[in-house]
C-alpha cells in the first residue's frame, strides 16, 4: 500500500504581524515664551529647525537654531522686513 505524506502550508500570515505601530517621538518645537513675558538670561525662547524666526536684540542662536535670551528682560516678537519675523529681549527699566 502506498502512503502519501501531505502537508498543507498556510496561505495567510499569522496574527500579530502588523506593519503599522511605529511613530517618531515629537520634537516639541515652537515658541517657549510668549510676547511680553519676562525671561531670565539663558532661557529658551523658540525651538526650531532652520531659521523660521531670526534672533533680534539680546537673543542668541544655538547650533540647532534654538533662540535663547542673553539678558534678563521682556520678550518681544517683531516683524523683520516684509516676510520675516524676529524675537528680541529688551531690558526692563529699573524703578527708582
From Swiss-Prot:
Any one GO molecular-function label of the UniProt entry: structural constituent of ribosome
Pfam family name, one: Ribosomal_L27
Skewed-composition ranges (Basic and acidic residues): 20-35
Residue ranges annotated as propeptide in the record: 1-9
Keyword tags: Ribonucleoprotein, Ribosomal protein
GO aspect biological process, one term: translation
PTM section of the record: The N-terminus is cleaved by ribosomal processing cysteine protease Prp.
Biased composition (Polar residues): 8-19
Region (Disordered): 1-36
Record has Transferase as a keyword: no
GO annotation, cellular component aspect: cytosolic large ribosomal subunit
UniProt family annotation: Belongs to the bacterial ribosomal protein bL27 family.
Protein name, as recorded: Large ribosomal subunit protein bL27
Underlying gene: rpmA
